Amino acid sequence: MAILVKRTGSLAADGVKILTYGQAGAGKTSLIPTLPSPIALSAEGGLLSIKDANIPYIQISTMADLQEAYMWLKDSKESKEYQSVALDSISEVAEVVLADELRKNKDGRAAYGELNSTMAELIRCFRDLPNKNVLMTAKLEKSQDEMGRILYAPSMPGKSLTQQLPYFFDFVFPLRVEKDAEGHTQRAIMTDGDGLWLAKSRSRSLSVWESPDLGAIIRKIGGENE
């Protein structure tokens, strides 16, 4: 078998894989049009906010829909025109999977075990789509630590899956919505955790705070900093 030697500098060329999360109404879906040449997989039916962007999308209502969409993205000639895939949202997909498992399995613990296995495989499959940027959005989970601090992280059904989710991605970005000193609402992507908000980036090219423009962020990661 021939060994194929690659260089780490070309990793971004295979696509940047991002998980972003935030509160309802933060504008996670509005990040999709900022991706290079995107197609959306909508499991939430919440694309009205980007209606004017006229983004192509595939409606996901069942696991069969998701599996069919994956095979189309992986194998079809038509999918090659899209540089980015957005799955909105992975939290909602997990809820669909869990409901299906609970219908099939009376043992709740076994159902959650199947959920973890199914979602791990699904996330890896979409994350590893070659030559495509991949964005997955997630809901926000708030928890409290032993010191009484409120912690923020991406949310999934089941404690185990919630804890595993960030490890699948090189980039985990909360979409923050805050008021500035003058009372104006500001939206920004956070790329580094502060002990309260879970965030991470494998790239040294990003600032702690970035504008909510994933195309610009991807260019920075790929060494095309403007």
Predicted regions and their residues:
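Conserved P-loop
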Residues: 2-87, 91-96
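P-loop NTPase motor core
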Residues: 84, 89-164
